[in-house]
Amino acid sequence: RYCPSGCRKKPYGGGCSC
């Protein structure tokens, strides 16, 4: 999956960090 603009994807697959 992709994260919203301005957010980063967590390396552990925990979702997105905004």
Curated annotation (Swiss-Prot):
Keywords: Amidation, Disulfide bond, Secreted, Toxin
Cellular component GO terms held in the UniProt record: extracellular region
Top-rank lineage group of the source organism: Eukaryota
Keyword Lyase among UniProt keywords: no
GO molecular function, one term: toxin activity
Expression by tissue: Expressed by the venom gland.
Main location: secreted
Keyword Secreted in annotation: yes
Coiled-coil ranges from the UniProt annotation: none
Disulphide linkage map: C3-C16, C7-C18
PTM-bearing positions, type Cysteine amide: C18
Cell compartments where the protein resides: Secreted
Family the UniProt entry places it in: Belongs to the poneritoxin-Ae1 family.
Name the UniProt record assigns to this protein: U1-poneritoxin-Ae1b
